Amino acid sequence: MRKVLAIETSCDETSVSIVSNIGDNFKIHSNIIASQIEDHAKWGGVVPELAARKHLELLPFVLEKALAESEIKIEEIDYIASTVAPGLAGCLRVGSITARSLCMLHSKPFLGIHHLEGHLSSILFSENYPKKSFLTLLVSGGHTELIKVDDRRRMQRLGKSFDDAAGEAFDKVGRLLGLSYPGGPAIEKIAKNGDPMKFNLPKCKISDKKGGFLKYDFSFSGLKTAVLRLVERINLDGKDVPIPDIAASFERVVAEVLVERTIKCAKDHRLENVVLVGGVAANNTLRKMMINEASKKSIKVHLAPLNLCTDNAAMIGAAALFRIKFKDHLSSLKLGVAGRLSIEQANTLYEENPPF
């Protein structure tokens, strides 16, 4: 049994987890998450400098609690991993420096993990996760991507958002409607009392320079603007803004766009399994719609556990364990952090000469 201590500090969650695996069975011994939502709520979004300072403040206590809850001593840990890219650079440094310091102090090997690979790996804690090639819809506050993953975990991005990520659109529309931060849960809650067919909002597409549209790519800024114009028009008419109906209509359109393009991509690439991960993957409308529409095309949907959809260190540990399983190179202790790094570049984190 290999045991990994993992650290996640890429944005506004401070998390430490102890995970292990025996073959294809992955186990969480502890997964402590300290959220900063209340600290950033009054600003309507994450403030990078504030987030980094909170990580510095919280990480020692989160680390101590994770070890205590797991009942595993740090001397019994086999590997230490942390998120190193992409994310907020100041936040990433807190976790990375802590992890590498622990490695030097306790003579442990280090793995720097790509944050999106971590989200992909959250599915390893679900029952009957796909062992063969599959398509992942990774949908969160900072990313909306379609990623093909083969049985060796080699990753290829097939689609992406050209502007706002879906989660970012939820936050912005939530703020526009006067809802609390984060916008995703707030919109989902109030949308339950609304009519999802009340308003005909646009499903925006990205033009292809060769003609037509890019089949697997996303754009949510136009949808956000359409909601803004709708609210302005209702206000000009002197009417009350039907917030539940607007929220429900917005939620429906986002889900439809994500589901339609995911299933199209899976069918075109002859992939029989779709994996849904990331913070927005916790949205019940999206989960139900994906399962219902995929079943019509004989595609099986695998959902990340609800408690592992948002940022957490368990998924980072799972990614590390999978790397170790296939004997990928360990990361250099000289490896730094990067605010941006595509998923196709994840393997560079294990090269002898670090990319940053």
Swiss-Prot record:
SUPFAM superfamilies: Actin-like ATPase domain. This is tRNA N6-adenosine threonylcarbamoyltransferase. It is an enzyme of class 2 (transferase). It is found in: Cytoplasm. It comes from Prochlorococcus marinus (strain MIT 9215). Pfam families: TsaD (PF00814). Its cofactor is Fe(2+). The keyword Transferase applies. Fe cation binds at H115, H119, D311. InterPro entries: ATPase_NBD, Gcp-like_dom, KAE1/TsaD, TsaD. The lineage of its organism: Bacteria, Bacillati, Cyanobacteriota, Cyanophyceae, Synechococcales. Keywords: Acyltransferase, Cytoplasm, Iron, Metal-binding, Transferase, tRNA processing. Its main location: cytoplasm. GO terms for biological process: tRNA threonylcarbamoyladenosine modification. One of its GO terms (molecular function) is N(6)-L-threonylcarbamoyladenine synthase activity. The gene is tsaD. Belongs to the KAE1 / TsaD family. Substrate binds at L138, V139, S140, G141, G142, D171, G184, N283. NCBIfam families: gcp_kae1, T6A_TsaD_YgjD. Gene3D superfamilies: 3.30.420.40. Required for the formation of a threonylcarbamoyl group on adenosine at position 37 (t(6)A37) in tRNAs that read codons beginning with adenine. Is involved in the transfer of the threonylcarbamoyl moiety of threonylcarbamoyl-AMP (TC-AMP) to the N6 group of A37, together with TsaE and TsaB. TsaD likely plays a direct catalytic role in this reaction. Binds 1 Fe(2+) ion per subunit. The keyword Signal does not apply. It catalyses: L-threonylcarbamoyladenylate + adenosine(37) in tRNA = N(6)-L-threonylcarbamoyladenosine(37) in tRNA + AMP + H(+).
